[in-house]
């Protein structure tokens, strides 16, 4: 809810698919109060991984022993496991956000 996707074709000038025609989508937010960007992003990643398993991969860690970039953004390694349902990841993220909101209350000045 709150977003419309339309097909998009482009040719990247850099990175893995530089110079190759690629298909994707343009996301247009129609209702900023209804769209949930984190949930949408994770659901899209899960769908892409499901539809194109041979082509889907996470960017590798920048340094050996480090976490992949997406895991760093997420704050944990849950999404690296292909069997981890998006709904479980989102529930975990909601619990962590609620815990953070409670902890930060002590630091509010007004």
Give a label for each model feature.
Residues 97-110:
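Structural signal for terminal/edge beta-strands and the immediately following C-terminal loop/tail
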Residues 1-92:
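Conserved functional hotspot residues or short segments at active or partner-binding sites
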């Amino acid at each position: 809810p709150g977003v419309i996707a339309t097909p998009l074709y482009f040719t990247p000038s850099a990175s893995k698919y530089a110079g190759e025609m690629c298909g994707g989508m343009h996301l247009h937010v129609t209702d900023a109060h209804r769209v949930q960007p984190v949930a949408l992003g994770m659901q899209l990643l899960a769908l892409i991984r499901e539809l194109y398993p041979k082509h889907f991969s996470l960017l590798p860690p920048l340094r050996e022993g480090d976490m992949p970039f997406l895991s760093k953004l997420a704050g944990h390694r849950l999404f690296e496991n292909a069997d981890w349902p998006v709904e479980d990841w989102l529930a975990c993220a909601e619990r962590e956000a609620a815990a953070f909101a409670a902890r930060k209350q002590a630091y509010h000045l007004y």
